[in-house]
From Swiss-Prot:
Disulfide bonds: none
PANTHER family associated with the record: LARGE RIBOSOMAL SUBUNIT PROTEIN BL19M, RIBOSOMAL PROTEIN L19
PROSITE patterns: RIBOSOMAL_L19
Gene name of the encoded protein: rplS
Name the record gives this protein: Large ribosomal subunit protein bL19
Species name: Bacillus subtilis (strain 168)
Length: 115
């Protein structure tokens, strides 16, 4: 039974996504269904956490929209994500960047690294 579950989850895993870590700025292209039509919506922000492993792995992206912080959590291997672009690689010393929720303006900047 365990082998069967592993085989099914292995074929569901996506391999077309770029490597990214907390602190990186991503542009996530999400498929949104409105009525009978489907369109792509772009959500761009900083990855503040990545958790789990395998098929249940998720990541959370935070952005500021009209002065309000918006966080959205995505499963990594969902078919709802059309593609992920890494806009900027950030250098941070934490795995979970919850402290960014309290910071405003220039204090919330993340140092950029070249890769």
């Amino acid at each position: 039974m365990q082998k069967l579950i592993e085989d099914i989850t292995k074929e569901q895993l996506r391999t077309d996504l770029p490597a990214f870590r907390p602190g990186d700025t991503l542009r996530v292209h999400v498929k949104v269904v409105e009525g009978n039509r489907e369109r792509i919506q772009i959500f761009e922000g900083v990855v503040i956490k990545r958790r789990g492993g395998g098929i249940s792995e998720t990541f959370t992206v935070r952005k500021i929209s009209y002065g309000v912080g918006v966080e959205r959590t995505f499963p990594v291997h969902t078919p709802k994500i059309a593609k992920i672009e890494v806009v900027r690689y950030g250098k941070v010393r934490r795995a979970k960047l919850y402290y960014l929720r309290e910071l405003r303006g220039k204090a919330a900047r993340i140092k950029e690294i070249r890769r």
